[in-house]
């Protein structure tokens, strides 16, 4: 859910341009590989919202949007664990999002309703109206649980890091995540109705994270040039 539809498209274009610029102009490193992937994903989510509002395939694009943002926590955690340099079977991180993505694709009535209002795109999914509340619980636990784990690992890496520039990079990533996603977590718990709408955070998060990515990639590029 985001301001529609021109803001969604403009945000998507901005993110595609920034992600491409990072790939082209910044030296290759784990951080500068992660940022483009993540920003392209955020940009595609904004694109799905634009398509939802401007085509006759609203249900399809609503599903694509759900699938897109469902993979974000797994990508976050994948990145954080890679930073720790621990051995880990990364494929296991994607079991839950793959399951719910397949569910969304195969279930014809997965999207209950979708609409574009003056300011927002509102999508209501069967996942949160299911007669099996366990599915909603698993999805919510995965989503916010992985984000919490990401923050935990990143904070741990930050505390161990001696390089001042790298510490700044980790702090920027951590702050962008904390500021934008924890309000959604609180609203998700305090206001149950918000569970239909919490992806709206990605409109604000996309812009903020893109700015954070530019700064962090610039700093990381300075480190890579010194090597």
Residue ranges and their predicted role:
Residues 89, 111, 120-121, 129, ...:
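Compositionally biased, low-structure terminal segments
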Residues 117-135:
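Juxtamembrane membrane-water interface segments that cap and precede transmembrane helices
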Residues 22-27, 81-90, 152-171, 218-226:
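Juxtamembrane membrane-water interface segments of multi-pass membrane proteins
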Residues 2-5, 21, 166-227:
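Interfacial "cap-and-anchor" motif at the non-cytosolic start of specific transmembrane alpha-helices
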